[in-house]
Amino acid sequence: MEIKNWYELTFEIETNLEEIIIWKLNELGISSYAFEILLNNKNNKKVIIWLPHLNWPESLRIKLVRNIKEVLDKNNYQTNCFEWNLIEQEDWISSWKKYWGPEIVGDNLLILPCWLELPEEYKNKKVIKIDPGAAFGTGSHPTTSLCLEELEKISLSSKKILDIGSGSGILSIAARSFGASKIYSIDNDYLAINSTESNFRLNFGNLDNLKTYLGSFDGLVSKYTLKNFDFILCNILAEVIKGIIPDIRNCLKIDGEVILSGILNSQKDEIIKLLKASNLRINDVSSKKDWVCITAQKIP
């Protein structure tokens, strides 16, 4: 179904609340948003959220504002200034494009919006082209960049990869760019699956090394034979990760590794405890801002 119109919600927050708002939006399954620095008040930022018109009736929009206000109230910030606008597809495209530019991640990766030319100074970078569509993961958020930086460290040549919560497909594309031979991508949102396939084709011209599955990870594991993976990439909410760690272990080959992101610092210890309880050895823990990425390995 083609999205024709979008609701645009704007409000202001203190700059230090950006990460907690991102976490809340991710928890609510909202992935089209941006933050804008205010020139007249550099201690605050404007939050812009875009929502597909047909999926967000008034009752859900009221509930969304209530959820955001609760988060802000808990962090000692009060506002009642929430502004809604209904915008057409063309206006939405021009709105979010202005927040995009080339994004360097790690040592060698460049995330490039598909409508931009590759700048001359980045010719030596490994380029991942992205058409974000409804913006399911771009590389700019710490959870995604942490995963990409971990992928740079390891040898993926001829490896079999599972990407749980593929979103825009950015991690699947990076894995293939680093030499993975077969990528299996899972998401429970059909728009994300479409985005994964579209962006994979944009980068490689075909889908020969990609297989996609629409549905929840635990449901797909029981339906299909998803086993013997060298690496599993999982950039989703920690609350979801907690419930699927045993299934993740079962999908890995012996000595296979999982890269987990989407974890707040405050959630790290609990996730590590659950990984160890499932006989997954912690190999690496990295952090950026309030977020943590954990790499763990299946041991006999």
UniProtKB/Swiss-Prot annotation:
Role summary: Methylates ribosomal protein L11.
GO cellular component labels: cytoplasm
GO biological process: methylation
EC number: 2.1.1.-
Origin superkingdom: Bacteria
Similarity comment: family membership: Belongs to the methyltransferase superfamily. PrmA family.
Keyword Zinc-finger assigned: no
Keywords, sorted A to Z: Cytoplasm, Methyltransferase, S-adenosyl-L-methionine, Transferase
Binding site for S-adenosyl-L-methionine: T144, G165, D187, N235
Protein species of origin: Prochlorococcus marinus subsp. pastoris (strain CCMP1986 / NIES-2087 / MED4)
Entry annotated with the keyword S-adenosyl-L-methionine: yes
CDD domains hit by this protein: AdoMet_MTases (cd02440)
Molecular function in Gene Ontology: protein-lysine N-methyltransferase activity
Name by which UniProt lists this protein: Ribosomal protein L11 methyltransferase
Enzymatic reactions: L-lysyl-[protein] + 3 S-adenosyl-L-methionine = N(6),N(6),N(6)-trimethyl-L-lysyl-[protein] + 3 S-adenosyl-L-homocysteine + 3 H(+)
Coiled coil: none
